[in-house]
Amino acid sequence: GSGLVGSEMCIRDSCKTGAFGVNVSVCEDCGCISVHYNSCRDRCCPMCQEFPKEKWVDARREDILDAPYFHVVFTVPEELNPIIYSNQKFLYSALYHAASDTLSELAADCKYLGTDIGYICILHTWGSTMNFHPHIHAIVLGGGLDVKNHWKDNGKDFFLPIKVISKTFRGKYMAELKQLWENDRLEFHGSAAPYKNYYTFKELLNTCYAKEWIPYCKKPFDGAESVIRYLGKYTHRIAISNYRIKDMTESTVTFSAKDYKNQGLWKEITISGEEFIRRFLMHVPPKRFVRIRHYGLLSCRNKSKKMTHCRNLLGCKKYISALKNRSATETVSYTHLRA
């Protein structure tokens, strides 16, 4: 509602202005005084993501193995966008359920790998132009533990056929969507309003079932360090970063975006300030919604024992966090020195 929109924009507009307090430093030698304005710490603020990203990525180093990793992207047909946007908490969660069930169940099938694997799922809801484009990025460990607790992988080849992933993911997501509709758990606002009618909703299901859902699997990462760099790039990303904003006037904003209809070349787009804010706010996640989730060997209940066992089987050294127990000031100093 308008209250949420106002509060979200007000918070970010006040970041590092003094509205959230200040820290004052005084030099013991010369008495020079420095004033540092506090940040808003909002997870959608472009100025506040670097610090939590560095701490999170550094902690993830303890979970990384010297083993193959793959990047799989799960997308849904654009026809579902209106109903997903009207039911973000339920239907974003359904994306995680469908993606995780697909990966875990197929990996456990002896026809493919026959193991318990580990992976991280990250929700992004935007395209390059800040359009609404919900999709899941999954960083998938390319091996796992079989029923005898032995390590098994498929080398540098991804162990699951893309067509099988596609059909399985489509079936699981559509089944949960249908169940939510039948249980009267969905809301129908704006362009989703027609789907409150059973026959219109049924037509939507038929259209989406008839489409090929094309998950995307990238080449394997080149070692554990490249996985870490990739996690840093994707995990705490927001709809648009400051460097992409090229110009602003009293009424317009110009920003750069990739043109995927023209070989992914960058182009500049100018839209009204109101439209820019509208697009940005589409990607504010529901309150307390967890965007980064861990599964299988990497889940909280498993990783302490099972990842240690995997590390021993593979002969991997355990990375010790460089930032654990450091203060915010020490963390900032460390990351700046490393850069």
Which role does the model predict for each range below?
Residues 1-6, 11, 336:
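Single conserved hydrophobic/aromatic residue that forms the stacking wall/gate
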Residues 57-136, 140-338:
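Catalytic residues for metal-mediated phosphoryl-transfer on nucleic acids/nucleotides
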Residues 22-24, 42, 333-334:
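Residues immediately within or flanking Cys/His clusters that coordinate Zn2+
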Residues 7-8, 12-25:
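N-terminal alpha-helical interaction blocks
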Residues 25, 29-31, 134:
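Polyanion/phosphate-binding surface patch
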Residues 28-29, 46-50:
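Short, cysteine/histidine-rich loop/knuckle motifs that typically chelate Zn2+
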